[in-house]
Amino acid sequence: MVKKVAIIGAGISGLASIRNCLEEGLEPTCFEKGEDIGGLWKFSDHVEEGRASIYRSVFTNSSKEMTCFPDFPFPDDFPNFMHNSKLQEYITMFAKEKNLLKYIQFKTIVSSVNKRPDFQTTGQWDVITEKDGKKESAVFDAVMICSGHHVYPNIPKESFPGIKLFKGKCFHSRDYKEPGIFKGKRVLVIGLGNSGCDIASELSHIAEKVIISSRSGSWVMSRVWDEGYPWDMLFITRFETFLKNTLPTVISNWWYMKQMNARFKHENYGLMPLNSTLRKEPVFNDELPACILCGIVTIKPNVKEFTEDSAIFEDGTVFKAIDYVIFATGYSYAYPFLDDSIIKSRDNEVTLFKGIFPPPLEKPTLAVIGLVQSLGAAIPTTDLQSRWAVQVIKGTCPLPSVKDMMNDIDEKMGKKLKLFGKSDTIQTDYVVYMDELASFIGAKPNIPWLFLTDPKLALEVYFGPCTPYQFRLVGPGKWPGARNAILTQWDRLLKPMTTRVVGSPLKPCLFCNWFRPVLISVVSIAALIVLF
């Protein structure tokens, strides 16, 4: 009997889940609150309650070769980093190519998801939905939650004494759409994440004054990396990951900080993280350093107190006559349709095995797709998550015991806290995490075997960027075009930029990218031995 799967949300996680259910012979039904697919990437001029929202000028932070669905490369002429409308175009192309739209019920709200009385034996769920004021109930063999984590804005007003006295306007960055109304205004942006930096940089060209207040600082990276290549094509590699995880901590931290400071010294710009060794996801902004250098954006410490029209910072300085306060303070994740006892949260900690499965469930028929954050792109991550989840739901890939899953969660949590800090406990190392998931379903590339049988491909897989195609080389859902996609990925990267041909477009030397850090590390270790 074919298993029926309810999928909540038709963003990238939902589409990946629909597609992978179909590949494995399951029967998906996707419930989408809005009128279209795309989730976060579907721009709207107005904010809808219960839906993710972006501003008009949002661009991707991951390049196209690292962002695509693993068997559906972006068209050659698409830019490497793209406007949200361009990514939405690609998402629509994917959904139509894979014939996914007919499995989606639009304008449908999921009201509740509850275990059936016989859940211990069947693993089934009662799902109640609402459309046009009419409620319906249906039974599903499994549920995949794909509603994202950019829905419920976090506005910690209790952390800012006097904010209730402030007479200007204050709102969350989720409500920001475009800069027009801020012309000639004085704006305080609280938060140094991607949204805060994007908004501050955009407003700096039209507002009278823009200040960013940051409690802990952040690394700020450019999308343009060494020799002009996209940052992630050089930064996210298997060899880079190997070095990062095997070198002595003092060397690894030193090299990481050197990479982060390669473009500019963060101390000089007031951006340096309080704990500079944490591997928190950096901010991606090509404009902010120039805005600071030109004096059109100012960085300040945390706000100590608000008055009726001013903000007093912890260093004693005051920003007066503020018109707007924008809280770019992130989001809280919540599942209002689900009993809290199923997915427990401790502080900012989610109790999910590999960020997907709640360990205590008697039957592993509930999966959360797209909650985990990593330095890698969301699309390939959610694709691999849903591939594994589908195998678990089918019963072909059993989970470990509850005890083993909880031990794994606790072990990983300790490592995450050390690497990323307490506020980013759903963050994880991209390559390590992807390999873990891939190994569960036999989709992890066998690097030693590749070097023996296909050295040309092996060099690209190990020393080149860890592109999504690598996870469709083998295993269920393997793609015959994966090898060629890997060997031609640099051609697609260069294609949209060669609009004025001057000589031959140059691909990077893979060995040069890793030889330098190895050499520096060896010299550093030798120096430490000599000195101590």
Curated annotation (Swiss-Prot):
Its localization reads: Microsome membrane; Endoplasmic reticulum membrane
Pfam family of the protein (one): FMO-like
Look up keyword Transport and say if it applies. no
- Sorted alphabetically, which SUPFAM superfamilies does this protein's record hold? FAD/NAD(P)-binding domain
Q: What is its main location?
A: membrane
* Residues bound to NADP(+): T60, N61, S195, G196, C197, D198
Report residues binding FAD.
G9, A10, G11, I12, S13, E32, L40, W41, N61, S62
Q: Which InterPro entries match?
A: FAD/NAD-bd_sf, Flavin_mOase, Flavin_mOase-like, Flavin_mOase_3, FMO-like
* Assigned EC number: 1.14.13.148, 1.14.13.32, 1.14.13.8
- List where the protein spans the membrane: 510-530
PANTHER family linked to this entry: DIMETHYLANILINE MONOOXYGENASE
Protein name per UniProt: Flavin-containing monooxygenase 3
Q: Please report the organism this UniProt entry assigns to the protein.
A: Bos taurus
